[in-house]
UniProtKB/Swiss-Prot annotation:
<dbReference type="InterPro" id="IPR036688">
    <property type="entry name" value="MoeA_C_domain_IV_sf"/>
</dbReference>
<dbReference type="InterPro" id="IPR038987">
    <property type="entry name" value="MoeA-like"/>
</dbReference>
<keyword id="KW-0500">Molybdenum</keyword>
<dbReference type="InterPro" id="IPR001453">
    <property type="entry name" value="MoaB/Mog_dom"/>
</dbReference>
<dbReference type="Pfam" id="PF00994">
    <property type="entry name" value="MoCF_biosynth"/>
</dbReference>
<dbReference type="Pfam" id="PF03453">
    <property type="entry name" value="MoeA_N"/>
</dbReference>
<keyword id="KW-0808">Transferase</keyword>
<keyword id="KW-0501">Molybdenum cofactor biosynthesis</keyword>
<dbReference type="GO" id="GO:0006777">
    <property type="term" value="P:Mo-molybdopterin cofactor biosynthetic process"/>
</dbReference>
<dbReference type="GO" id="GO:0046872">
    <property type="term" value="F:metal ion binding"/>
</dbReference>
<keyword id="KW-0460">Magnesium</keyword>
<comment type="pathway">
    <text>Cofactor biosynthesis; molybdopterin biosynthesis.</text>
</comment>
<dbReference type="InterPro" id="IPR036135">
    <property type="entry name" value="MoeA_linker/N_sf"/>
</dbReference>
<dbReference type="InterPro" id="IPR005111">
    <property type="entry name" value="MoeA_C_domain_IV"/>
</dbReference>
<dbReference type="GO" id="GO:0005829">
    <property type="term" value="C:cytosol"/>
</dbReference>
<dbReference type="InterPro" id="IPR005110">
    <property type="entry name" value="MoeA_linker/N"/>
</dbReference>
<comment type="function">
    <text>Catalyzes the insertion of molybdate into adenylated molybdopterin with the concomitant release of AMP.</text>
</comment>
Length: 419
């Protein structure tokens, strides 16, 4: 097999090439209690104000503010309590001069009242109370529509549904929600050196760790994963299984077979299914031979067989694509600044991604490499919740330097690519 010359592109350009492809986002209706983690497929318009009515934010007494004018420590003003209302109840009485209604948090302000006195601001007797300060018009009142007005867009298409979104949907009576259907992902590990997880070890062999790892990463999105048997280095069989996976799923991820060795068949597989190669080399370490193709409106990700490189490829390239397929408005990795806690002296001819442990402290975010830092590392991934991103063309970072970090355990994404 002839060795193909590959021209590397930047990480940013690689992500752009993935995201510019046109993909079909299919919408479905699901039950509200099944919608967590999905993406809204339509704007949600408020059908009424929030709050729906003027209400009390405190336990206290509803009064007319004009009756409190002139109150002081030397001139306490007395009010007669004529009713008592809790949240969900409405008083039928109208407050007159120096009258008050005992009111609980969330209850509707009764007719005639325009202020609320908190219990702790009063001295109570059996049917009366006194105050020593005056109150302004609408003091201590939550006003109708102060948060949302009827007709406002309260939730936007492309938002990820979290607990707060579910609260809003429930508020407006949505038992069914229009969402983007989550894609299904096929995972295929390749390589004659691979054994299944349950197999006994043999000389020169390793167990397939990438397949279960990719499955777990995909399931963090709550998407269905189809696992295919480990494919050994046989071109015809590999082509057959990739075609099958492509016909059964929305996205195909293979691990291994992306390098330039005699048994790395991915270029031939893509050629046989007439896939468009978006890129096959990225100026990054690890994972420089990450390859992404597009066929029949579907992505094919060829990730490295080295575990850390495979993990890096999923975080950088698969996640934005899955977000796009889910109809998300925010698709891109969230990058933050953190203080490096130990020296990293290795040269970085290309963008370097380091598995790391990020910690939020009182002084801010800190980050430290999580262990052995080579592309084949496995254990370092288990202790990582982040990736340090060091720019190409640099050499030597010292403890105390500020570095870019991707929080890999975060479910927050950016609308713009900020690499």
């Amino acid at each position: 097999m002839s060795v193909e010359k590959r021209t590397p592109i930047s990480v940013k350009e690689a992500i752009k090439r993935i995201m510019k492809q046109h993909v079909e986002v299919k919408n479905i209706n699901i039950n509200l209690d099944e919608s967590l983690g999905h993406i809204l497929a339509e704007d949600i318009v408020a059908t009424y104000d929030i709050p729906r009515f003027n209400k009390s934010p405190y336990d206290g007494f509803a009064i007319r503010s004009e009756d409190s004018q002139g109150a002081s420590g030397e001139n306490r003003i007395e009010f007669e309590v004529i009713d008592h209302i809790g949240a969900g109840s409405v008083s039928e009485k109208t407050i007159d001069k120096n009258q008050a209604i005992r009111i609980m948090t969330g209850a509707q302000i009764p007719s005639g009242a325009d202020a609320v006195v908190m219990f702790e601001q009063t001295i109570e007797s059996e049917t009366t109370f006194t105050i020593r300060k005056s109150f302004k018009h609408l003091e201590n009142i939550s006003l109708q529509g102060e948060e949302i007005k009827a007709g406002d867009i309260v939730l936007h298409k492309g938002m990820r549904i979290n607990s707060g979104v579910i609260a809003v949907l429930a508020t407006y009576g949505y038992t069914k929600v229009r969402v983007a259907r989550k894609p299904t992902v096929a995972v295929i590990a390749t390589g004659s050196e691979l054994l299944e997880v349950e197999d006994e070890l043999e000389p020169g062999k390793i167990r397939n760790s990438n397949g279960p790892m990719i499955k777990a990463l995909a399931k963090q999105f709550g998407i269905q994963v189809g696992m295919y048997k480990v494919q050994h280095d046989n071109l015809e069989k590999s082509i057959e299984v990739v075609k099958k996976a492509l016909s059964e799923h929305d996205l195909v991820i293979t691990t291994g077979g992306v390098s330039v060795g005699d048994f790395d068949y991915l270029p031939e597989i893509y050629k046989s299914i007439q896939a468009q190669i978006l890129f096959n080399k990225v100026a990054q370490r690890p994972g420089s031979v990450t390859t992404v193709a597009f066929a029949d409106g579907k992505y094919l990700f060829g990730l490295s067989g080295n575990p850390s490189a495979c993990y890096t490829g999923f975080e950088l390239y698969v996640k934005p694509a899955v977000n796009k397929l889910m109809g998300a408005k925010a698709c891109y990795p969230q990058i933050i600044k953190a203080t490096l806690m130990e020296d990293f002296n290795k040269a970085n001819p290309f963008t370097r991604l380091i598995r790391a442990k990020a910690t939020l402290t009182k002084a801010g975010m800190t980050v430290i490499p999580s262990g052995f830092n080579k592309s084949g590392a496995v254990v370092a991934i288990a202790h990582a919740n982040a990736m340090i991103m060091l720019p190409g063309g640099t050499r030597g970072f010292k403890a105390g330097n500020i570095v870019d970090v991707i929080l890999t355990e975060s479910n927050s994404f950016e609308e713009e690519l900020i690499l």
